[in-house]
Amino acid sequence: MIDKRRSRERMVREQLTARGITDPAVLAAMRKIPRHLFVQEALQAQAYEDHPLPIGYGQTISQPFIVALMSQILRVTPGMRVLEIGTGSGYQAAVLAEMGAEVYTVERIAGLQAHARGLLRRLGYARIRTKLDDGTMGWPLAAPFDRIIVTAGGPGIPEPLAEQLADPGTMAIPVGASRREQELYLMHKNDGALSYENYGKVAFVDLVGNHGW
């Protein structure tokens, strides 16, 4: 049986701070949240290792560093409204909630959405709003959002998400012509103008939907 608290401390020290994650809110959240509960029981011993893990339905939970990186570059502050596309296991949503965000998260796979919603509630994150839908369409009735985080890679930035981003606002999204490899972009909206930062190569599961693959 793994020592979960020590495993989290080691994860934060060796995978996050050693690789440039400095945001105190991100580090505190990932030090606190029991990541092993967000993976299948047979894989819990690997939950704090530096790689993604399958969570069923052909989907994965991202490696800890990628979760931390995306959370950090978004510069989330308490009270911000954050839309997550791709609930998956629910882990990223929990991190954002621990950072003080008002989280809305959309998942297209019913089994994952139901499991994540139940787990988040059991862990005390009942205020996270979850929805079963095509994530590339966003959540129009709850828009606009100060931040949007997309945890799947598509061929471009879905127009509905760009429209639902507040001004000013920031979106983190993997984009690439290949389904196997993308680049992580941070898109900023300011006074109607869009600008982009590139954070390098990443590999995410497919962003599936009307405005994805």
From Swiss-Prot:
UniProt xrefs under Gene3D superfamilies: Vaccinia Virus protein VP39 (3.40.50.150)
EC number: 2.1.1.77
Name listed for the protein in its UniProt record: Protein-L-isoaspartate O-methyltransferase
Gene of this entry: pcm
UniProt keyword Cell cycle, yes or no: no
Disulfide bonds: none
Location of this chain's protein in the cell: Cytoplasm
Keywords linked to the UniProt accession: Cytoplasm, Methyltransferase, S-adenosyl-L-methionine, Transferase
UniProt-listed CDD domains: AdoMet_MTases
N-terminal signal peptide: none
InterPro entries named among the record's database cross-references: PCMT, SAM-dependent_MTases_sf
Family designation: Belongs to the methyltransferase superfamily. L-isoaspartyl/D-aspartyl protein methyltransferase family.
Highest classification ranks of the organism: Bacteria, Pseudomonadati, Thermodesulfobacteriota, Desulfovibrionia, Desulfovibrionales
Record-level GO BP terms: methylation; protein modification process; protein repair
Stated role: Catalyzes the methyl esterification of L-isoaspartyl residues in peptides and proteins that result from spontaneous decomposition of normal L-aspartyl and L-asparaginyl residues. It plays a role in the repair and/or degradation of damaged proteins.
Annotated organism of origin: Oleidesulfovibrio alaskensis (strain ATCC BAA-1058 / DSM 17464 / G20)
Catalytic activity reported: [protein]-L-isoaspartate + S-adenosyl-L-methionine = [protein]-L-isoaspartate alpha-methyl ester + S-adenosyl-L-homocysteine
GO CC list: cytoplasm
Catalytic residues of the enzyme: S62
Alphabetical list of Pfam families matching this protein: PCMT (PF01135)
Gene Ontology terms, MF aspect: protein-L-isoaspartate (D-aspartate) O-methyltransferase activity
